[in-house]
């Protein structure tokens, strides 16, 4: 079976299971039995689907379309944050600036150098 055929069978089975579940909730015993048998069929077809999808991935048949790839790239990029400005409140004492200050961004921790032990010469002869 091809991957598309297997996917089609799975969707058909899922739809019929859903319809029979609604009937089984109302008390239909035959529908409940159909749900049980169809769920077993679905398990078997799902196993086939997993195998076929792995083969398709290895062969390169399941590639993303160009539009989907562009959306994924756009979502991966993070927007650049602008520097935040904080305005000081005016005060009544002496001189107070009302200029906006740029809040500094956090810097990475400075790298520490690893100290190496000094080699000592032995005095034994």
Curated annotation (Swiss-Prot):
Q: Name one Pfam family in it.
A: Hc1
Q: Does the keyword RNA-binding apply?
A: no
Locate the region Disordered.
Answer: 98-125
Which classification does the entry list for the species? Bacteria, Pseudomonadati, Chlamydiota, Chlamydiia, Chlamydiales
Q: Which GO terms describe its molecular function?
A: DNA binding; structural constituent of chromatin
Q: Where is the composition biased (Basic residues)?
A: 100-125
Report the family membership: Belongs to the histone H1/H5 family. HCT subfamily.
Q: What does this protein do?
A: Might have a role analogous to that of eukaryotic histone proteins.
What this protein is called in its record is Histone H1-like protein Hc1
What are the record keywords, sorted? DNA-binding, Repeat
